[in-house]
Amino acid sequence: MKKSGVLFLLGIILLVLIGVQGTPVVRKGRCSCISTNQGTIHLQSLKDLKQFAPSPSCEKIEIIATLKNGVQTCLNPDSADVKELIKKWEKQVSQKKKQKNGKKHQKKKVLKVRKSQRSRQKKTT
């Protein structure tokens, strides 16, 4: 009798813990940015720029800039300067991606040319 009672209680506890484990805890007002930087940030000093959309844990848009010296600062998403900085950053990132893809494409062309030159050399000998 005692064993069945203990097993029953363990089963109930297990079911409760499984239900609790998957439940997300929603906390309103837990934003990463408490205040925003009022100064100007230059594109050359940026290492990374991340934008976070409103979520259940934070109701406002957050923009966090990581500078080349490692300092992270929050930017005001409503500022005209910040909006311009975001446009320039996105343009710079897309240009870097294009350059990177272009270099890969050029390497493939060089390899193809070298292979075709080798096959021509084999045919002539």
Swiss-Prot record:
Its main location: secreted. GO terms for biological process: adenylate cyclase-activating G protein-coupled receptor signaling pathway; cell-cell signaling; cellular defense response; cellular response to lipopolysaccharide; chemokine-mediated signaling pathway; chemotaxis; defense response; defense response to virus. Pfam families: IL8. The keyword Disulfide bond applies. Residues 1-22 form the signal peptide. GO terms for molecular function: chemokine activity; CXCR chemokine receptor binding; CXCR3 chemokine receptor binding; cytokine activity. Induction: By IFNG/IFN-gamma. The induction is enhanced by TNF in dermal fibroblasts and vein endothelial cells. The keyword Disulfide bond applies. Residues 93-125 are annotated as: Disordered. It comes from the Eukaryota. Disulfide bonds join 31-58, 33-74. PROSITE patterns: SMALL_CYTOKINES_CXC (PS00471). Residues 94-125 have a biased composition (Basic residues). It is found in: Secreted. One of its GO terms (cellular component) is external side of plasma membrane. Transmembrane segments: none annotated. Keywords: Cytokine, Disulfide bond, Inflammatory response, Secreted, Signal. Cytokine that affects the growth, movement, or activation state of cells that participate in immune and inflammatory response. Chemotactic for activated T-cells. Binds to CXCR3. Belongs to the intercrine alpha (chemokine CxC) family. This is C-X-C motif chemokine 9. It comes from Homo sapiens. The lineage of its organism: Eukaryota, Metazoa, Chordata, Craniata, Vertebrata.
